[in-house]
Amino acid sequence: TIPRGQWKFSADRGSVEMAAGFEPHRIYEVVYTAQDPVLVGLGPAAVRDFHSYLKHGDTPVAPVRRAYAFGTSQSGRFLRTFLYYGFNQDEAGRQVFDGVIAHVAGGGRGSFNHRFAQPSRDAHPYMNSFYPTDIFPFTDVEQTDPETGLTDGILKRAAETRTAPKIFYTNSSYEYWGRSASLIHTSVDGRSDAPIPENTRIYMFAGSQHGPASFPPSRSIGQQRSNPNDFRWAMRALLAAMDRWVREGAAPPASIHPRVSADTLVAPEAVQFPKIPGVAFSTRIHKAYRADYGPQWKSGIVTSEPPKIGKAFPMRVSQVDPDGNEVAGRHAAAWDGTD
């Protein structure tokens, strides 16, 4: 912590100055007392009410019988937040969305419903680590964190009101390394697979990145060229599968993802990545930490800033074969849309 007397806000209050200068390659974070927060939290209510109106209201504009929600990355985390707070029940107690597809959201939710929330913030290995995005609970089913004693689940409220939709969680390989995806289907201690509700499916696209690159792949900031492995064909098949599931009750393909019980979901240091010329394999991974934002956090008010940080949750990733390819998950070249 840098003493307050060694730095100051600039005249326009838009930047920070320090007489001694800033060290290169370090990330500085300013903690200060703010005022006059903008109104946040209306988004989930607006999404709920608009789709409830289309589905249940007396409207000749666009009457619908079934409503599906799809979100990618940040909007996927929005949908997990939407479900967690019970917004899939409208004010009349009716179900809003029949089906939800949260894509490449990993284990996160988001800053969409608390004072001074910044929706665009999401935790990464090198920045924004302690913003309230990757926080307990992670699984749809209720679990108890032995470290804090908290018991909760993403679908706790929806299960109580019988308004839980049918759900697909789809993730790329990256989300297991950079977005804590393993937490959505493991026990809190990471030693076993967590139960998955009948209304939920989890799919992992092996050997893929957060969003497929164009082909031929180009160089970016990474060690290797961007990954063009395209999972959008499978996403189209899953959309059709979701529609059949809701309309006809036809069960979609079973969940497919790395599992602790199959030794395909392991700690990063246990990955048996082969030695490949020109490839440097790193076991550095984004971690989700137990964070205490203060006694009013349940009401959406942060009173402990920075938060009090506890132990990290155990992160797990997919094991690889002798060629370095992930052994679990959906392999695009081998999947024809059936299970």
Regions found by a protein language model. Give the residues of each.
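C-terminal His-loop and adjacent cap/lid subdomain of alpha/beta-hydrolase
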Residues: T1-D339
